Amino acid sequence: MGEGHRLPVASPRVAAIVPAAGRGERLGGGTPKALRALGGRPMLVRTVESLRRSRLVTQIVVAAPPTLVDAVAQLLGGDVYVIAGGAERVDSVRRALRAVDDDVSVVLVHDAARPLTPPELVDAVAAAVLDGHPAVIPVVPLADTVKEVDADGRVVRTPPRDGLRAVQTPQGFRRDVLSAAYALEDIAVTDDAGLVEALGVPVTTIPGAQEAFKVTRPADLVLAEALLARCDPADDARSAEARSAEARSEEPQFAGARSTDARSGG
C-alpha cells in the first residue's frame, strides 16, 4: 500500500511515535528486534497495545522496516499509521514526525523494545507535557555504581549515584520543540531528550516504572517472559509455543525480514 496506512482520527492532540525499523543485533536472531516474539506475540504488538490503552494518546505512528511496511500494518491494525523507517533511529523519528497529524500538539517517542511499559506511565508523561512542561522524560534510580573510564579502560572518576538516573520512554515533547530539535544537524545524542537539551530547552523528569525496561539482550527477553508469566499464566504457554516455533524456523512469521535496509532505525 505504498507510503503508509492511515485511518482518520478525530481531533488528535497527543501522538505517539514508535521507531521500529532497527535490527537489534545485540538481541541475536535474524528477525528485527521489534518483531521478536514475547509471550507468543511480537514485542511491537505489545508495545502498541500499551499505547492504545493510554487515555491521552490519540494517534500512533510506527516506523517499520521498509520491506515490511505492509506486513506490520496488517499486524497492528488499521488504527495505527505505519510508515517506512530510515537507516538510523533519528531518520525514523524524523519521518514519523512528519507523518503526525497537523492538529497534534504533544508528541511522545517510545521505544518499540519496551513492551511492558504501563499505560499509566504513558499518560503521566503526556499529562506533564499538556500541563506546560516542554519536554518530559521518565526516569528510575540507578541500582549499580557508575564509573567514568578513559580510552584505556582506567577509571577517571566515580560520579555520585544520588544525582544519576536511568532514562526510559516514552519521552514527551511539545510538538514545536521536538520539530526544532530534529531540525538540528550533526548532533550526536542517544535519546530524543538529548536533542532537546541541545536547544537549551529544560527537560523535566517524572518517576518511571520498573516494568518499562528495554529488551536489548537475551537476558532481558528472559526477564520479560518471566514477568509476563507471573502476570498471566496463559502468556507462559504462548511463550513455550513461540520458542518451539522459533526452534523450527528462525523467522517463522517474517521470512523477508533479512532483506530490510534499515539496520539500526529503531
Curated annotation (Swiss-Prot):
Any one Gene Ontology molecular-function term assigned to this protein's record: 2-C-methyl-D-erythritol 4-phosphate cytidylyltransferase activity
Sites annotated Transition state stabilizer: 26, 33
EC top class, as a word: transferase
Entry's Gene Ontology BP terms: isopentenyl diphosphate biosynthetic process, methylerythritol 4-phosphate pathway
Annotated segments matching region Disordered: 234-266
The reaction(s) this protein catalyses: 2-C-methyl-D-erythritol 4-phosphate + CTP + H(+) = 4-CDP-2-C-methyl-D-erythritol + diphosphate
Keyword annotations from UniProtKB, A to Z: Isoprene biosynthesis, Nucleotidyltransferase, Transferase
Compositionally biased tracts (Basic and acidic residues): 234-251
InterPro entries noted in UniProt: IspD, IspD/TarI, IspD/TarI_cytidylyltransf_bact, ISPD_synthase_CS, Nucleotide-diphossugar_trans
Domain of life: Bacteria
Protein name in the entry: 2-C-methyl-D-erythritol 4-phosphate cytidylyltransferase
Organism expressing this protein natively: Frankia casuarinae (strain DSM 45818 / CECT 9043 / HFP020203 / CcI3)
Taxonomic placement: Bacteria, Bacillati, Actinomycetota, Actinomycetes, Frankiales
